[in-house]
Curated annotation (Swiss-Prot):
Its EC number is 3.1.15.-. CDD domains: Orn. InterPro entries: Exonuclease_RNaseT/DNA_pol3, Oligoribonuclease, RNaseH-like_sf, RNaseH_sf. The active site is at residue 129. GO terms for molecular function: 3'-5'-RNA exonuclease activity; nucleic acid binding. This is Oligoribonuclease. PANTHER family: OLIGORIBONUCLEASE, MITOCHONDRIAL (PTHR11046:SF0). The keyword Nuclease applies. GO terms for cellular component: cytoplasm. Its main location: cytoplasm. One of its GO terms (biological process) is DNA metabolic process. The gene is orn.
């Protein structure tokens, strides 16, 4: 499939916490869509190995959330490092989107970009400097159209691939109900 500069790359990461100076990436997934949000390709879901000391140092929320989802055990069993995961994602994305063309798409993606900058800098540079952050529309709906805001039932599973599809669905919802285009 030929790369297309109008496609959008959706990314989500799960991390051991929120501070990229202390925490690390434990899961990352990508999905490529057309501009109209039709899915073109689902990338690999990559679980990144991190040492037990880092996993043990997670706060209670992260231990509980990633424990219930089974992610902690997957991280312990993984042999994939951040550099390997980055390379796999770059190879996948190069098949679908030219470098530097797609904004980084997702929910609260400035957080993902901070972790990419620290631990996957080549992947961070693959994206255009712009972001397509669904949370912007969510915040506008909360303030300007509360009924629209309350109309989207967010599951927040905190699993990278599921969260991407939920972000795409949420943008479709806001496109129809808030933007009305």
């Amino acid at each position: 499939m030929a790369a297309n500069e109008n496609r959008l790359v959706w990314l989500d990461m799960e991390m051991t916490g929120l501070d990229p100076e202390k925490e690390r990436i434990i899961e990352v997934a990508v999905v490529v869509t057309e501009a109209d949000l039709t899915v073109v390709a689902e990338g690999p879901v990559l679980v990144v190995h991190q040492p037990d000391s880092l996993l043990d140092a997670m706060d209670n929320w992260n231990k509980s959330t990633h424990g219930k989802s089974g992610l902690i055990e997957k991280v312990k069993a993984s042999t994939l490092g951040e550099a390997q995961a980055e390379q796999i994602l770059l190879e996948f994305l190069a098949e679908h989107v030219p470098a530097g063309k797609s904004p980084l798409c997702g929910n609260t993606i400035s957080q993902d970009r901070r972790f990419m900058y620290a631990y996957m800098p080549n992947l961070e540079r693959f994206f255009h400097y712009r972001n397509l952050d669904v949370s912007t529309l969510k915040e506008l709906a909360r303030r300007w159209a509360p009924a629209v805001y309350k109309g989207f039932d967010k599951k927040s599973r905190h699993e990278a691939l599921a969260d991407i599809y939920e972000s795409i669905d949420e943008l479709k919802y806001y496109r129809e109900h808030l933007l009305k285009v």
